[in-house]
Amino acid sequence: MAHIKRIDLTRDVEAHADAYREAIEKVCRETAFSGGKYADTFDKEFAAYVGSRYASGVNNGTSALHLAMLALGVGPGDEVIVPANTYIATAWGVSYTGATPVFADCTPDTWEIDPSVLEAKITDKTKGIIGVHLYGQPFDYAGVREIADRHGLFVVEDCAQAHGAQFEGKNVGTLGDLACFSFYPGKNLYAFGEGGSVTCEKEEYYKHIDRLKNQGCDVRYYHDEIGYNYRLEGLQGAVLSVSLKYLPEWTKRRQEVGHRYIREITNPLITMQHHPENTTPVFHLFVITVPDHEDFIRYMAEHDVECNMHYPVPCHLQKAYTDLGYQPGDCPNAEYLAAHCVTLPLFPEMREDEIRRVIELCNAYRQ
């Protein structure tokens, strides 16, 4: 019986090898390696895809979050509220500025930042809120925005896992003050290495981010502020332009597989993420909870199906943030997820027999 990977990038690379090869060879012939026209072209294409006025390509999603915080004036002494249930880079973007991430629990059903707990987290040091469209499912932007507006706070979208998702008919990446994307391999839109982007509507944010990522200068060798080497490589821009052409097709396929799992996995021991009707998820990850996730992962591995966890330790209990004083029980929903989560295989190139096998194994577990 063939092994089913949690994700298999080789199928896409092989299917579109000629297009990728042609793009890479163009960059090599022109030696357009650092920034340049291929990165700029992708910025325009990605802004058009998202529906934002601007997109500024950067070297990875973590840098995108850092730049967003800097552009919004976050610095030492400030606080920014972030979800406890997310990948750690969401918090890094705050910490890199010298500010403090304040971790908020997730809801028990969508597993995303819970607007009902935000008021208690706000202090006179709070500058804003980062919401994460986790696993490809848009968070409750309206609920978060209402609280943010009442307190004069910014809202940043972490869209690293949600390229093409929608909240109330609007694309993620166009909702908040700024939005951050990742193109890490395995993301719904991915580079051949690392990449990221910041999208926004305000020209002042766009120009500031462009300057910061380019060593703090608008004109070469004239540095107006301390900057960073966060540019998107030309090679990655060219690859991403190719990948972007296929993204709608990949998204449709992810949604087909995701909704198939929702309909056909009926084991009462398995709980799935809730998808509110006013959202359109893109199923970057298909995460479930089970009573004993290590046992479930072993069971699937015995049947040659690879599963893993997103994420085994919530942010507020990570060793790196011990100094903030969080304790077990501070974010109970996020902690429950960490102790029970499993990520099932899901990628656009999954074959019918693989999808059926995952469903059958899930339904047979402990039954």
Positions of predicted regions on the chain:
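PLP-dependent aminotransferase-like
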Residues: L70-C159, Q166
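N-terminal "arm"/small-domain region of PLP-dependent enzymes with the aminotransferase-like
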Residues: M1-A32, K37
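Conserved active-site segment immediately N-terminal to the catalytic lysine
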Residues: E157-F192, R220-D224
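PLP-dependent aminotransferase class I/II
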Residues: T10, E22, A39-E45, Y49-A55, ...
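Phosphate-binding glycine-rich loop
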Residues: T31-E79, G93-T97, F103-D105, K170
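Short beta-strand-to-turn element immediately C-terminal to the catalytic PLP-Schiff-base lysine
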Residues: F181-S182, G196-K202, S241
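Hydrophobic/aromatic ligand-binding patch that stacks against planar heteroaromatic rings
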Residues: W92-V94, I147, N171, N188, ...
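Structural detector of well-ordered beta-strand residues that form the stable sheet scaffold
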Residues: S56, I81, V102, V155-V156, ...
